[in-house]
Amino acid sequence: MSYISRVEGRVVGRLVQLIESTRGQEEQGRGGEGHHRMGITRRAEDFPLMISQYGLSSALTFFLSKVGRDDSGLLDYGVDYFKGPVVNLDQERWKELASDAGEEGKGYVSYLALVLVWPLGEAMAGAGLNGVVNGLKLSGSDHVRGAAGLLLRNLQGIQERELLLEVAAMPGLLELKKITRALGR
């Protein structure tokens, strides 16, 4: 098993866990009636399409603009959650992340945390943007937004690098779209 497949397996396992935890709140929120799609499912549908229409930098900038300063700590927590073993699961943060993933108009924080680990995080490492990937591992406030900003600065003016990242990440992004659709039903 390769490193990427282990990362992918862990991330997808964490995604399943997150989506499963939203099932109860989803049923309560809609009273069992009507059609409701989880926020993370909508974001998983939107992001690849935005990349193909506007490019990775524009799509990432738009998604980051939807993450408020108050949510940056939650984004940090989400990246840590998807990255590896969470020894001491912060129940409040977990509830916030699950709420973000489950609410129809939200999902930006949980989806960005997910893709910054895999597949975009892996594509960045493969493209030699290890400084950005390592920035995601730092502790401290707002480090994820800072690392994403670093990614955007690295992409400016280097269209070939952006296209390489798009091509490398797109298969994984499309898989996440399928997985969230299947789990969100």
Residues covered by each model-derived region:
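Small/polar/charged residue-enriched interaction surfaces, especially the RNA/DNA-contacting tracks
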Residues: 1-185
